[in-house]
């Protein structure tokens, strides 16, 4: 779980693989509240249950399909689009923590040459064949570029807090 605001990025926590989507959703909701996040993006590759659990908590999180269509015609898919935006963000002064694992993961994927000139990022399967781990920390940065984020209004915060009140049949 990570946070990007403007030119600053930090990893809030790392979680071991967990099959309990509710626990992950509760932790994500806590960070959303503590950090006053304007948007939460969840990797659709394993996060559909997390988003469903979040809906039960009154949350409106966005699933991101890395293989989905890119809004940038120069990119093969959403994954390539997000990597390109992260690259541009870093070039413009984006700051990442002093984390050797994150640094290595950001440098690991290679671009795949294509006849049509579109940017394609090496697949995780191909990275694994080269002996590289899945770039989970890097993915937590690049997913923050999935869609434009609009600052929430104070009314949005009230809607979330009021939607999480428990029903009391005796009240």
Model-derived regions, located:
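Mg2+-dependent endonuclease catalytic cores in nucleic-acid-processing enzymes, primarily RNase H-like
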Residues: 7-119, 160-171
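Charge-patterned, long linear interaction tracts outside catalytic cores
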Residues: 98-158, 163
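Gly/Thr-rich phosphate-binding beta-strand-loop-beta motif of the actin/hexokinase/Hsp70
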Residues: 1-6
């Amino acid at each position: 779980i990570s946070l990007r605001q403007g030119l600053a990025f930090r990893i809030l926590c790392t979680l071991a693989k967990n099959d309990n989507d509710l626990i992950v959703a509760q932790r994500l909701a806590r960070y959303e509240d503590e950090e006053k996040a304007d948007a939460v993006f969840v990797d659709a590759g394993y996060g559909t249950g997390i988003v469903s659990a979040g809906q039960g908590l009154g949350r409106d999180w966005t699933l991101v399909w890395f293989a989905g269509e890119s809004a940038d015609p120069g990119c093969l898919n959403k994954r390539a689009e997000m990597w390109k935006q992260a690259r541009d963000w870093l070039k413009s002064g984006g700051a990442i923590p002093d984390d050797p694992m994150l640094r290595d993961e950001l440098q690991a994927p290679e671009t795949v040459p294509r006849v049509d000139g579109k940017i394609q990022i090496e697949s995780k399967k191909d990275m694994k064949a080269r002996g590289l781990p899945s770039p989970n920390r890097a993915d937590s940065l690049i997913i923050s570029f999935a869609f434009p984020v609009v600052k929430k209004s104070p009314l949005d915060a009230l809607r979330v807090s009021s939607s999480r009140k428990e029903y009391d049949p005796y009240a």
